[in-house]
Regions:
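Conserved AMP-binding/adenylation subdomain of ANL enzymes
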Residues: 176-193, 200-290
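Conserved AMP-binding/adenylate-forming
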Residues: 284, 288-409, 415-418, 438, ...
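AMP-binding/adenylate-forming catalytic core of the ANL superfamily
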Residues: 93, 110, 362-364, 372, ...
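Conserved pre-ATP/AMP-binding loop-to-beta segment of ANL
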Residues: 19-22, 139-157, 164, 187-193
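Conserved ATP-dependent adenylate/AMP-binding module captured primarily in the ANL superfamily
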Residues: 49, 91-119, 137, 178-195, ...
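Conserved AMP-binding/adenylate-forming core of the ANL superfamily
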Residues: 24-69, 77, 94-99, 146, ...
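Conserved C-terminal "lid"/linker of ANL adenylate-forming enzymes
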Residues: 446-449, 480-535
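A cross-family acyltransferase "interaction/gating" segment
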Residues: 222, 720, 749-755, 760-830
Length: 847
């Protein structure tokens, strides 16, 4: 046995080699956390020892039902170190399916997200959000668990029927050998960053998207949301250079680019540029389309794609833009890649050549057969399937392909999808669908074999563009046009217009042909899915589950008329959290201002269905953090900080509490005057003056349609100078709080301190008001020290009694005290409202 073919050896070696190099970035709702190779290994050892403490040992099975992130990665690797068999469950699965899999494999434990209800089982379980807190109590007693290369690492349940799913067994040797096979033909440099957009429950993400880039010392970025806006922002912030994606992702991204080109009236110019680029070297193509590259982060270079067929036209489009697209072929049963296009051996339209140390041949009916160390030893407790899928040591993939003269493999479709025509000829839907999809007005299509009069007929199910108006005659004419392109045996003999927003799809966005065929045969819905950015008709249950989870009440007690505040107890703290959960669950953009004290559950459903989102009437001035702005700020502050000396004498207390402060940090202060910021920043030591200050968006930053010229000049002039002088940024006091919170996360990620006034407004009485609940949620999410600051005496010098009129002229000369308290470390698992009260008392009690 070769210890080098275990994931345990693999991960330990990487930790020793790359040590403090970043391995994982995780973008939470508001900020990004980084974990080095050494930290990743230690966390994984923590998971291994946690399982051992639970009496879960080598060969036992555990489930993971969560979103992508550093916790998921730690659990996967912790199981690899301990020999415990991990069974990943797709995060979109229902609780009943989780319970079914738990019974099938005899699971001992469940790691799950608190975003999902715990299945009614006797399993012990732990929320992944609590994993760090749990691991802090676990001693690392053991580092070698005796894992061998043939030990089972995981069982992956493929997207078959939920009544009888198939569990694919994968060993350590399967995983590591496949990584080595890919790495041998596609080495990459360690300065690359890979962005994860596929679920870790899928092998395409686990190997090419996670373990393969780690083998070269690269970093992998995980997102709390896979919305397009979050993906684009991650590409920019993390300078992503590699993505592993399914073809439909590339197709959707292409359509987005083409829509923008059309909106700008540049279609003809764009087509000419595409035509020209085919004759240019790749650097020139990247320069020609530099605006697109800039939008996608500027450093994105290559896509690895598999999971379904990549249309040659789609591949040529991205290649023409200057990107590298490498298509491969593989299955869960083959631990992903069997063939792959590479830098030196690539052919458009093919899925590449066979990887080293593997074998591929074509069996009867051109079925792809393969064998190698990467191929599964079999299905979990399924002898019938095991007997059917192997022959003389060869694994029968169920896919159809053909080789060209240079042994490039071309994928032709699934054997089970093949339609046997009345003439006895083989018809492959995958050959027909690209032709149909090129027809004007066709969003997508699914070709099936429909039985009529004892014969199997080629039937097209067509999803039309939302804005297109079609009748049957128009569609029939379009089918005729397609048939003129298709071969005689491929002729479409009938069609249906798909009535739903989208086809039902797998977690990798492939169309589920079974439910489509069922609906066409029965003439009734089979539970279709929805387009991106729209809500399924069955979304009510999902919304109720989220609300019940957030409000900590029984879902049965919630009705459509339940009020978010009076019935469910969701105050302003929960508003941002609810919006974040809804946006991620339904892939929407929702404005927090849509929810108020009068919103009911039915109102939430209407808001989600309508995808209401107000326009943001201000931006965040990132130029204020550049070096020229910082130098100018220091010079201006030399003069500005003398102004308070004209009407006050300042005493600073508690500076010793800042001596060992680890930055970045959040400073929270009471709000007595618009001069507060001058006193607080001037009182800070020089090393802490890398700080950004929150200011009310509606006062200094917000411009709305219809605003007067006076308002426009005020915002442009005063907003500019205030931003330059004090590095102010807009904080919404109504809607768009989440945007401001995200910007604060960006500031903290870049090492900036932040000054906040949690009261949300200047006091009109001189007494400190209660802190807004959002400060609890924010400080928990940012996970940095919180420093309480109290300003005393300034209100009596510059009192504000009218909220609509800010006072700038002092009434008298006086004494002002600025008091710094001891930094507070916020418990991320505490009640956010209690955190807000703790922060409030910390400021109130300073003297």
């Amino acid at each position: 046995m070769d210890a080098r073919l275990t994931i345990a050896y693999y991960i330990k070696t990487l930790a020793e080699k790359y040590e403090d190099r970043p391995a994982i970035y995780f973008k939470s709702a508001f900020r990004t956390f980084s974990f080095s190779y050494r930290q990743m290994y230690r966390r994984s050892l923590g998971v291994a020892n946690y399982l051992a403490q639970k009496g879960i040992n080598k060969g036992d099975r555990i489930l993971v039902w969560s979103y992508n992130g550093q916790e998921y990665a730690s659990i996967l690797l912790g199981c690899a170190l301990s020999g415990v068999v991990v069974v990943p469950i797709d995060f979109g699965s229902k609780a009943d399916f989780v319970r079914l899999i738990a019974e099938k494999v005899g699971a001992r434990h469940l790691f799950h997200s608190r975003r999902r209800p715990v299945p009614q089982t006797s399993l012990s379980h732990l929320c992944v959000e609590d994993l760090d807190q749990e691991l802090a109590e676990v001693p690392i007693d053991k580092t070698d668990f005796g894992v061998r290369e043939d030990d089972v690492y995981e069982i992956i349940y493929t997207s078959g029927t939920t009544s009888d799913p198939k569990g694919v067994i994968l060993t350590n040797k399967n995983i590591v050998s496949n990584i080595l096979h890919i790495a041998e033909v596609m080495p990459i440099s360690s300065d690359n960053t890979c962005l994860s957009v596929l679920p870790l429950s899928h092998m395409l993400e686990q190997v090419p998207g996670f373990l393969y880039p780690l083998s070269f010392g690269c970093a992998v970025t995980y997102l709390h949301s896979r919305k397009s806006t979050a993906v684009i922002e991650a590409l920019r912030r993390h300078r992503v250079s590699i993505m592993v994606a399914v073809p439909i992702f590339l197709s959707v991204l292409r359509e987005s680019i083409l829509r923008e080109v059309q909106a700008r009236g540049r279609e003809r110019l764009f087509r000419r540029m595409l035509s020209l680029s085919s004759h240019l070297p790749r650097p020139a193509r990247r320069f020609l389309f530099r605006a697109i590259h800039k939008k996608l982060g500027g450093r994105l270079e290559m896509f690895f794609t598999a999971g379904s067929a990549l249309e040659p036209a789609l591949e040529e489009f991205w290649t023409a833009l200057g990107f590298q697209v490498y298509q491969g072929y593989g299955l869960t049963e083959t631990t992903t890649a069997v063939t792959l296009n590479t830098r030196t051996h690539q052919r458009t339209g093919s899925v590449g050549r066979c990887l080293p140390h593997q074998e591929v041949k074509l069996g009867p009916e051109n079925e792809i057969w393969t064998r190698g160390d990467n191929v599964t030893p079999g299905y979990w407790e399924n002898p019938e399937e095991n007997a059917a899928r192997w022959e003389d040591g060869w694994f029968k993939t169920g896919d159809i392909g053909e080789f060209d003269g240079e042994r490039y493999l071309f994928f032709r479709g699934r054997l089970k999808n093949m339609i046997k025509s009345a003439a006895g000829l083989n018809v492959y839907p995958e050959d027909i669908e690209p032709v149909l999809c090129k027809m004007p007005g066709v969003k997508d299509c699914c070709v099936i074999g429909l039985e009529e009069g004892g014969d199997i007929r080629v039937h097209a199910v067509i999803l039309l563009e939302k804005d297109e108006a079609w009748d049957n005659e128009s569609v029939r004419s379009m089918i005729t046009s397609a048939n003129q392109i298709l071969q005689p045996h491929q002729q479409i003999q009938g069609f249906s217009i798909w009535p739903h927003e989208d086809f039902p799809r797998t977690n990798t966005l492939k169309i589920k042909r079974g439910p489509v065929l069922q609906e066409i045969q029965q003439g009734k819905p089979a539970g279709g899915a929805t387009r991106d950015n729209t809500v399924p008709q069955s979304s009510g249950d999902r919304i109720l589950d989220l609300l019940a989870n957030l409000a900590k009440v029984d879902v049965q007690t919630i009705t459509t008329e339940s009020n978010l505040v009076s019935d469910l107890g969701l105050d302003s703290i929960a508003r941002v959290e609810l919006v974040t959960m809804l946006e991620e669950e339904f892939n929407l953009e929702i404005d927090e201002g849509a929810f108020d004290a009068g919103t009911t559950v039915s109102g939430v459903k209407e808001i989600v269905a309508a995808r209401q989102s107000e326009t943001l009437h201000y931006g965040f001035r990132r130029w204020s953090r550049t070096w020229p702005a910082r130098v100018a700020r220091r010079l201006l502050q030399v003069v500005a900080f003398r102004v308070p000396s004209l009407f006050s004498r300042t005493t600073v207390k508690g500076r010793e509490n800042l001596a060992g402060l680890k930055t970045p940090a959040i400073f929270i202060a009471n709000h007595t005057s618009q001069y507060d910021v001058f006193y607080v920043v001037r009182a800070l030591p020089w090393r802490l003056r890398k700080i950004a200050l929150a200011a009310a968006a509606d006062i200094l930053f917000e411009l709305k349609p219809g605003d007067s010229w006076g308002r426009w000049l005020y915002v442009r002039f005063c907003g500019f100078w205030a931003t330059l002088l004090m590095n102010l940024f807009p904080l919404s006091r109504g809607s768009h709080v989440k945007r401001s919170f995200e910007y604060m996360g960006e500031l903290v990620d870049d090492g900036w301190n932040v000054l906040l006034y949690p009261e949300g407004k200047i006091t009109l009485t001189g007494e400190m008001d209660r802190f807004k609940g959002g400060i609890g949620l924010l400080t928990q999410a940012l996970q940095v020290p919180v420093v309480p600051v109290k300003i005393d005496g300034l209100y009596s010098i510059v009192p504000t009694t009218d909220p609509d009129r800010l006072r700038w002229i002092p009434e008298r000369f006086g004494r002002v005290s600025v008091i710094f308290g001891k930094p507070i470390q916020i418990d991320p698992q505490a009640d956010p409202d209690q955190v807000a009260r703790t922060c409030e008392e910390a400021v109130r009690n300073l003297s």
